[in-house]
Amino acid sequence: MTSAPSTEDTADAEPRGFAAERLTFFSDAVVAIAITLLALELPLPEGATGAELLRSLGHHQSEYVSFLISFVVIGGHWRAHHRLFDHVKTLDGGLVRLSFGWLLTQVVMPFATKVIAEDGGFEFRFVFYALVQVVALTLFLLMARRIQLNHHYRADTPPELFGKVYRGVGTMAAAFAVSIPVAFFTHWAYACWIVVPLVVNLLFRLRRRADAA
């Protein structure tokens, strides 16, 4: 007599049946919702005259800057996701779970943006936002690693794809991670998000030139 499949086997068998395209489409929808929620949090300027409107815009400057930063960040997450999942042909349970964890961080992004835009307690607000990014980027690296190790990618996948993903996403994860301790000393911790990638890219180019020489 054939034994009944275990609950764990049943749970793992179902995600394997999901088409990679369906997960990609679902991810696109979640990211779109996150960006929509991000925009809905923007405060409306108030005032009866142009001068009052300008003063109101200045008063909410931190919210607008935080929105622009998060829009670029979410866009970067989405771009990296598409660059990787365009080459994914199969899924497994672990990859689906990692994907849902990554999507959760995207949904949390509007809340993290609102937190970092508030006044007072800069260290806590900054660290919370940066930690959300570190978790999101780490989950993405784990997804890429699982796709590579379990051969979930198509045969025509460029051989340099995973190296580029690890370098690009890993650099951004390092930038956000480095900014966390810096935030306890200066509000210029934001600069780490730009300086670290620039330095890493410069070092990579210098190394590539040295190898080519």
Language-model segments: residues:
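Multi-pass alpha-helical transmembrane bundle typical of ion/small-solute transporters
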Residues: 2-213
